[in-house]
Each structure stands twice: as C-alpha cells, then as structure tokens.
C-alpha cells in the first residue's frame, strides 16, 4: 500500500485511492460503507455530523493508515469499542482476513453487521463489552478514541496472542498516556506520524506485559 502523503482539504474517494493504492472494488465497498453511514447516522449518532463531509479523510484514511503497520501475515485482528467501525471495519475491507469488532451498543452493533453484510467484509460483530467478549487469539488489537492507554492495555491483553501487537492512533496526549501506562505495564513502543492528524501519533506496541511479569 502506498505511503503517499495525504493532500489538503476536500479529500475524496479518488484521493483515497491515490494515497493508498486500493482497487476499484475496494473503493466501491468503501463507498457503500459511506452511504450506510450517512443513512444510519441521524438515528444513532455514529460519528459527529461535522465529519461526514470529510469522511474519506477523517474516518477512512485515518483508519487505513494503520494497515501498513500490521505485521506481515496478520490474520486475526480484534477492534475494541468499534463504534462506527473505525478502524476495524476499514481494515477488514482492506484485506485483514478475520476481524472481530467489539461494540457493546446494540444499535451500533446492528450497523456494523449491516455494513459487513453489504460490503462482504470478513468481520464478526460481538455486541458485548470488551471485558466479557471472547475472540480467537489476535495477531493485532486496535482501538480508536476509546480510552486512555492505561485502561486500554488490560483490555487488549485479553485478546493478544503471544507476540501480538497493539495499534492505537492517539492525539497530542500520546506521550503523557505512555508515561502513565508505563507505571503498570512494560512494552516496546514504536511511534509513527499520523497522516491525517499533524498533532497525532500512531502507536505500535509489542512485548506487552503487566509490570513485574516476565514475558514468556
């Protein structure tokens, strides 16, 4: 997938295709996703209404930039607090073979199932809280705008297989969140610039363990 820098405002489907090098079929599936998002959003407030006119950058590109950070051979991804499906459902459409979307809100879970059905995305929706949901051991766990790292890590650890990674897009609080999380967790941290948020960072975390526990 291309690493082309994202253009300025008025980012549309054709810009997304140029930036990420996706096929016409993938673009059509994302367009169907956009149509469903616009249809359902007034009733269940999936995303801020102000972001709908910039959905290709604010939501699709923001999610798609994580694809290149997945380990080679990633098969199972668990997305926590999926909401409107970002980033998990976009990553499923882009080609992750098995994605599990954890979303406790029943209405949002219904939306996710409908998008997965219409687009043919390989996604399973779990209408449960992350503390109770069950999924296969994951090669990667993702979450966007769900919680502080200190709260995310114990949730993610439930699903990660040994050697798995976490991908968390974060805003300007990333450094502070890492400092707090390291009080209770050890981890290897890789930080990448966000292509959609100049003040944000993409965190790729591996070798995650509660502080004091040996990684086996």
Swiss-Prot record:
Keywords assigned: Cytoplasm, Methyltransferase, rRNA processing, S-adenosyl-L-methionine, Transferase
Superkingdom of origin organism: Bacteria
Localization annotation: Cytoplasm
GO molecular function ontology, one term from the record: rRNA (guanine-N7-)-methyltransferase activity
GO cellular component labels: cytosol
Classification via InterPro entries: rRNA_ssu_MeTfrase_G (IPR003682), SAM-dependent_MTases_sf (IPR029063)
EC number of the protein: 2.1.1.170
Coiled-coil positions: none
Catalysed reaction equations from the record: guanosine(527) in 16S rRNA + S-adenosyl-L-methionine = N(7)-methylguanosine(527) in 16S rRNA + S-adenosyl-L-homocysteine
Positions contributing to S-adenosyl-L-methionine binding: 81, 86, 130-131, 144
Similarity-based family: Belongs to the methyltransferase superfamily. RNA methyltransferase RsmG family.
Role summary: Specifically methylates the N7 position of guanine in position 527 of 16S rRNA.
PANTHER family per the UniProt record, alphabetical: S-ADENOSYL-L-METHIONINE-DEPENDENT METHYLTRANSFERASES SUPERFAMILY PROTEIN (PTHR31760:SF0)
Protein name per UniProt: Ribosomal RNA small subunit methyltransferase G
Originating species: Rhodospirillum centenum (strain ATCC 51521 / SW)
């Amino acid at each position: 997938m291309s690493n082309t820098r994202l253009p300025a405002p008025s980012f549309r489907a054709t810009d997304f295709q140029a930036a990420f090098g996706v096929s016409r079929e993938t673009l059509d599936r994302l367009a169907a996703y956009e149509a469903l998002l616009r249809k359902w959003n007034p009733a269940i407030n999936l995303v801020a209404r102000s972001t709908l006119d910039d959905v290709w950058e604010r939501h699709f590109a923001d999610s798609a930039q994580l694809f290149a950070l997945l380990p080679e051979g990633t098969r199972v991804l668990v997305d926590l607090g999926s909401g409107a499906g970002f980033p998990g459902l976009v990553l499923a459409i882009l080609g992750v073979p098995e994605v599990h979307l954890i979303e406790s809100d029943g209405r949002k879970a219904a939306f996710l199932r409908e998008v997965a059905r219409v687009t043919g995305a390989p996604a399973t929706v779990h209408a449960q809280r992350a503390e109770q949901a069950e999924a296969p051991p994951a090669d990667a766990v993702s979450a966007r705008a769900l919680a502080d790292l200190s709260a995310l890590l114990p949730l993610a650890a439930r699903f990660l297989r040994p050697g798995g990674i976490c991908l968390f897009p974060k805003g300007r609080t990333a450094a502070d969140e890492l400092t707090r999380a390291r009080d209770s967790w050890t981890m290897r941290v890789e930080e990448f610039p966000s292509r959609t948020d100049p003040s944000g960072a993409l965190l790729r975390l591996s070798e995650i363990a509660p502080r004091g526990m040996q990684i086996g």
